[in-house]
Design a protein with these regions (language model features):
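Hydrophobic ligand-binding cavity/cleft-lining segments
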Residues: 1-48, 105-107
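Amphipathic alpha-helical hairpins
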Residues: 2, 8, 30-38, 43, ...
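Intrinsic-disorder/low-complexity, polar/charged segments enriched in Ser/Thr/Lys/Arg/Asp/Glu/Gln
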Residues: 3-7, 48-50, 65-67, 78, ...
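Hydrophobic/aromatic beta-strand elements that line small-molecule binding cavities or substrate pockets
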Residues: 6-8, 37-39, 55, 65-72, ...
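Short loop segments at secondary-structure junctions
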Residues: 12-14, 75-76, 100-102
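Glycine-rich portal/gate segments that line the openings of hydrophobic small-molecule binding cavities
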Residues: 39-84, 137-148
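Beta-strand/loop substructures that line and gate deep hydrophobic ligand-binding cavities in soluble
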Residues: 82-129, 133
Length: 148
């Protein structure tokens, strides 16, 4: 599956946007496709987080579970994440936050693969489209939360 790239401009300062993006435990409160996010491990300085996620795929009446490791860089305003284990065959990516004065650009790049045995190309295409929608919806949800 190709890389999913998405970007959004948020009407809010970078400190506020970055802080909300780091608060992954709160995501299920405002992202309906997420059932839960639980922190399993956090480094003393908070730069490394291992978390368990449960997502909901309504179209297929199923849930996806995965554990990921996030490496946050406060200075560069980035997060690099990768799959530890879970339902995905491949899951990795990065988030970058760019200061635009009173606005922030949030760039997301994710490489994700979800192999379903005996599923045809049409269904895989639907899954790829759904994953792109989920990334876009996540960025929109963070934008909505920051802009209030």
């Amino acid at each position: 599956m190709p890389k999913i790239q998405s970007s959004i401009e948020i009407d809010g300062p970078i400190d506020k946007v970055f802080a909300l993006a780091r608060d992954i435990e709160s995501f299920p409160e405002f992202m309906p496709d997420l059932k839960s996010v639980n922190i399993v491990e956090r480094s003393e300085d908070g730069s490394r987080i291992v978390s368990e996620w449960v997502g909901i795929v309504k179209e297929f009446k199923t849930t996806l579970k995965w554990t990921e490791e996030d490496i946050w860089d406060d200075k560069a305003r980035t997060c690099v994440f990768s799959l530890v284990k879970g339902d995905y065959s491949k899951y990795s990516g990065n988030w970058a936050f760019t200061d635009l004065g009173d606005k922030t650009r949030f760039d997301s790049e994710i490489e994700v693969e979800y192999d379903v045995p005996l599923v045809g190309a049409l269904i895989k295409g639907i899954i790829a489209k759904k994953m792109k929608e989920n990334v876009d919806n996540m960025l929109e949800a963070i934008k909505g939360r920051v802009e209030g």
